[in-house]
Amino acid sequence: MKFVGRKKKAYASAGVDVDLGNTLKRNIQRLVRRTHGAEVLGKIGGFGGLFRAQFRDMREPVLVTSIDGVGTKLKIAFAMNKHDTVGADLVNHCVNDIAALGARPLFFLDYIGCEKLEARVFDQLLHGFSRACRSAGCALIGGETAQMPGMYRKGEYDLAGCIVGVVDRPKIIDGRKIKPGDTILGLPSNGLHTNGYSLARKILLEKMRLKVSSRLPRSTLTVGEELLRVHKNYQPLLAKVPAGTIKGLAHITGGGLTDNLLRVLPKNCDAVIETKRWRVPGIFQILQRNGNVAEPGESRAAPLTRRRQSRQEGTEGAGQSGRLIQSAAPSGVERIDPEEMYQVFNMGIGMVAMVSTRDAAKVMSILKAKQIGHIERGSGKTQLL
């Protein structure tokens, strides 16, 4: 026993405190259990999570999976010393990704990689996971916390989340029924969500020389408060729309409106987005004015061609159609073509739905959405007007 005790102490001195990790995991059991229903079996802390799947209301249940992270939004959490919101961001981002296929969430697992485990940070993250999982009706059934001295800067960590949901096969939303003449609806975002943060930080913190505690121009919020707005969960609203009404859904993450619409468009259809149809939130106007970004209409590039497996800024959004290429953060803020604003940021639209014209008014009312464009015959492109 004395030998084991010495080994644990030596490991802690090397930067990995196993005892602290075990204590923290015991302390968060109450938060985790709040997300559990009768379908979750077994005890917390086992080698795997157990979930009893029963889908009596489905003819042909199909499991839907997604994995994602929060990107460099974490840098704002570090600077603000506030961590619960990025925990919720992670859950909501994953929920939205599977909701885009018509699925409802079943369970979620998290990963935290850190330089050293800090009790207060760990507690805030788990509060964020738990709160968002409860709101989504999703069980938090497992996680991994890895202490890796030398891998991260002091006080920093990385997050990843994996979600599993289910959809009845006849109700899968995959875009195949989209056709020319259909209406495109946009659901409002809550700020940047989890995308474009490398460029936003470059503009706000380096070019404008603001601090996270600085008040944003023409806003009651500080830079940090604005950038830590929580990624919206759209699944509860989408679930209210009658099955078969929505033909296609695009979660507007890394790649913005321009690229994410391409992921659901049939090859013979173009998405025409009328950018004057909604008011772009102030944070994007600030970024555009101060990032040497041209006003829409000053230059007009040809519509971007269809891309299936490329994304901007890593998980500032990863997707599930394949392993997606991540690009490095910009080394300087250059003049950006106006179309790039719609390829980096969500520009105030967090989810897009494609419906037939006859259903548009009904779905707009349910989703509290705006009509932002239409589908026309084409070759699988996004056009910005």
Label the predicted regions:
Residues K2-E39:
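N-terminal amphipathic/basic leader segments beginning at the initiator methionine
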Residues K2-S13, V121-A139, Y152-L159, K211, ...:
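Glycine-/charge-enriched secondary-structure boundary and capping motifs
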Residues V16, L20, V86, N195, ...:
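A generic structural signal for residues located within well-ordered alpha-helices
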Residues R30-N190:
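Glycine-rich phosphate/pyrophosphate-binding loop regions near the starts of catalytic domains
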Residues P180-L221, E225:
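Acidic, glycine-rich loop-and-beta core segments that form the ion-binding/anion-interacting portion
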